[in-house]
Amino acid sequence: MYESISVYHVDFSASSLFVSKFGVIRTFFFLPDNEVNAMSRSHPLQSQLFPPYAAALCGGAGLLLLLLALCRTAGLSDAPSRLPVGLCLVLLCALAAGLLFYEDRRPGAALFALLPIGLALFLRALCLEHVTYDYRDFLSGWASFFRENGGWAAVALPKGNYNVPYLYFLAAISYLPVRDLYLIKLFSMLFDVLLAWGGYRLVRRLSVPGSYCPCTAFCILLLLPTVVLNGAYWAQCDSIYGALCLHALASALDRRPAGSVVLLALAFSFKLQTVFLVPLWGALWFAGRVRFRDLLLFPATYVLTIVPALFLGKPLGDILGVYFGQAAEYSDYLTLNAPSLYALIPYGAEVDTTLAARLGILAAFLFTVSILLWLLLRRGRLTDRALFTAGAAFAVGIPLLLPHMHDRYFFLADTITLCWACLDRRRGIPAAILVQVASLG
């Protein structure tokens, strides 16, 4: 006897993501290498600095927005948290501007970027007080549990369904006299900045020298709706694994294979959804970009992330069972507000859940194998752009086909397609818009 379930609603944003997915595949499979390599040249090379007066105006406007953000923190409901949160916003602004100047070395670009940086922090300051059901029912209880059970000592106890690196964070903040809601959101906001930095590095690798495409990616990633909402509004932590994945991909294309594998393993230690991008390292291996001994750093790094928990007394079975528990938690639902193909099933339709899920898993497997096979056949002449496009196809296509997906599982697809849009306006912008609309839908 098969299980059956009534599909509760139809999310037609899945159709837009379906179109976007095949736009990515078309770029990868059907464009010749010379055109693929020339995609970023749709942006003219900009050799002149920004006009000084315009840069000064943008810098001043950005600082004004930062001041407004600080005014917002001065009115937070938890009075002891106001000053620490305000200082954290200032530090985040300094970090974002400093990273951009470190990478770009053009003062005009850094001054111009203060405007989107200030706006990004202002929008996040407006979101700090918002409490979601997920935070109220789960994260709040976990944070309180760590405060009440000895902080680091509580890591050994069976609380929370996140992997141990995030539990280390919850243990660390349990000693701080700041409201947990703000600390959790600020931690994600820190990785929002690191995510933008990863986008900068990735786009810089694929764009022509002197282009402002990397700066554009940095600024837009900070303002991307799903990035702003994920951490500052929903108190989620997808920017952590997203940032690490972008840096891993950038490092791989920069011919830093060992570092890329370590970053990928760190991303996996935070979020299981990193597996959407993992197949790309198989392509990097048979293309000679990554050695087998480099791949061994993945399990080694993961083991290092769980060693502190083992020393604190947490059973190995509890650690290794986290991701299996997450996978089983939503096994009764074909989709949880995710813009996957299952969202196209009409409202009220009776569906054989087991069969539909197996077909989706098979489709995702065949999709992944087909791209890897194509890359294998072209391994002697793979370009950075071809590898990047394959990564984008994995990030969009795998969660599109898999069952049991949550809407936030497209976070990586949102960020990678945004980087693509900064590189190629004609093809990338429509894909990025479709993916973003689907994620928010």
Please provide the spans of the model-predicted regions.
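Start-transfer (signal-anchor) and selected internal transmembrane alpha helices
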Residues: E35-A125, R204, P214-T216, T383, ...
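Specific aromatic-rich, kink-prone transmembrane helix
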Residues: W197-R201, I240-P257, I416-T417
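Perimembrane helix-loop-helix junctions
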Residues: F276-A300, L310-L312, L412
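Transmembrane-helix motifs of polytopic, lipid-linked glycan transferases
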Residues: L186-V208, F367-L377
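Loop-to-helix entry region of an early transmembrane alpha helix in multi-pass inner-membrane enzymes
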Residues: V164, Y168, V178-W197, T353-A363
